[in-house]
């Protein structure tokens, strides 16, 4: 499954090589490959590469959201060209109930481009993922740029509206069965069973 982020969050074409994301689901989880321009802005987070870093969204980052649109349970994965990552599990819009989960993430960086490879175990995914969106952020202050695979349609923009990646209504249909066959069933997640018990 290949995706290119070709628009800003509000629907304008990006002015650079688009961020490319490939998802390869397998027996134990999903391999997520990223190829993206490297902007070097803002500077690297202070956290150790290879480790979770809270509020990574304030830096240069590529994000993927996997949503069950009936329950509004979703997985948010953030990957940074400096090696830090952030995995959040949410139940209800913006309602984080688990964060900074460990992640197998490798990246390599050139002068103007970076590539990343993250392994997302099935246990991180909410049951029955039905929708997907992906985002990229870079730049500082008034040069901050927010990009979306599925942006807010321009005719729906409100005056003064700010970028918000948790507008779940703009996510689009997504089905792992397209790659894994109609018979395939998403493995149950112990993590999400725990969340269900906590409610």
UniProtKB/Swiss-Prot annotation:
It comes from the Eukaryota. Belongs to the UPF0462 family. This is UPF0462 protein C4orf33. It comes from Homo sapiens (Human). The lineage of its organism: Eukaryota, Metazoa, Chordata, Craniata, Vertebrata.
């Amino acid at each position: 499954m290949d995706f290119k982020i070709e628009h800003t969050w509000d629907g304008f074409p990006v002015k650079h090589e688009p961020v490319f994301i490939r998802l390869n689901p397998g027996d134990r989880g999903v391999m997520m490959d990223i190829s993206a321009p490297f902007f070097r802005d803002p500077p690297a987070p202070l956290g150790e590469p290879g480790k979770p870093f809270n509020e990574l969204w304030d830096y240069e980052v590529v994000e993927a959201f996997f949503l069950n649109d009936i329950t509004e349970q979703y997985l948010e994965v953030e990957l940074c060209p400096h090696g830090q990552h952030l995995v959040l599990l949410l139940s209800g819009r913006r309602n984080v109930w688990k964060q900074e989960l460990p992640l197998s993430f490798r990246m390599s960086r050139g002068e103007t481009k970076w590539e990343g490879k993250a392994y997302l175990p099935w246990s991180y995914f909410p049951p029955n993922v039905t929708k997907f969106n992906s985002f990229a952020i870079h730049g500082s202050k008034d040069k901050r740029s927010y990009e979306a695979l599925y942006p807010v349609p321009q005719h729906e923009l409100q005056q003064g509206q700010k970028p918000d990646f948790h507008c779940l209504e703009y996510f689009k249909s997504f089905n792992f069965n397209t790659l894994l066959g109609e018979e395939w069933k998403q493995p149950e997640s112990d993590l999400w069973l725990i969340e269900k018990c906590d409610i």
